[in-house]
């Protein structure tokens, strides 16, 4: 078993840290998003689960639906669903992408 205390990990802004990655299964990543910064409108090939560990974020989906939340918020995006994430305060996030890599992802090619 591998384990991490997500509340105490030293994660630098703009340097996502891959915690665990198993081909064909999932990839777990932590992010530090400073207050006022954002992950601009994007999509990923995998189903994306975003969990707020600390701070507060605002999530916008397809330029329409907006959800705001702090620690404990779980947002799940379908593969290729466009979204953006803004930090309302310094935020620490856990991102789980599954399956890893998803269909169409450049890393899925053998």
Regions found by a protein language model. Name each.
Residues 13, 27-44:
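Conserved short histidine dyad/triad with adjacent acidic residue
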Residues 39-41, 59-60, 77, 82-88:
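Short beta-strand His + acidic residue motifs that chelate non-heme Fe in jelly-roll/DSBH
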Residues 79-103:
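Ligand-binding loop in jelly-roll beta-barrel domains
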Residues 35, 45-46, 65, 81, ...:
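A generic "binding-loop/recognition-motif" signal
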Residues 53-54, 70-71, 89:
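A cytosolic small-molecule/anion-sensing beta-strand core signal
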Residues 1-27, 70-71, 75, 107-110:
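A short, N-terminal "cap"/entry segment at the start of jelly-roll beta-barrel domains
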Residues 46-62:
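Glycine- and acidic-residue-biased ligand/ion/polar-headgroup-sensing regions
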Residues 63-80:
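Short acidic-glycine-tyrosine-enriched beta hairpin
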């Amino acid at each position: 078993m591998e384990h991490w205390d997500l509340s105490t990990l030293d994660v630098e802004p703009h340097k996502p840290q891959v915690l665990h990655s198993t081909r064909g299964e999932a990839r777990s990543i932590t992010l530090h998003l400073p207050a006022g910064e954002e992950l601009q409108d994007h999509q990923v090939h995998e189903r994306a689960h975003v969990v707020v560990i600390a701070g507060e974020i605002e999530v916008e989906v397809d330029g329409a639906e907006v959800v705001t939340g702090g620690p404990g918020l779980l947002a799940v995006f379908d593969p290729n669903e466009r979204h953006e994430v803004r930090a309302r305060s310094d935020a620490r996030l856990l991102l789980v992408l599954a399956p890893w890599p998803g269909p169409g992802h450049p890393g899925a090619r053998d």
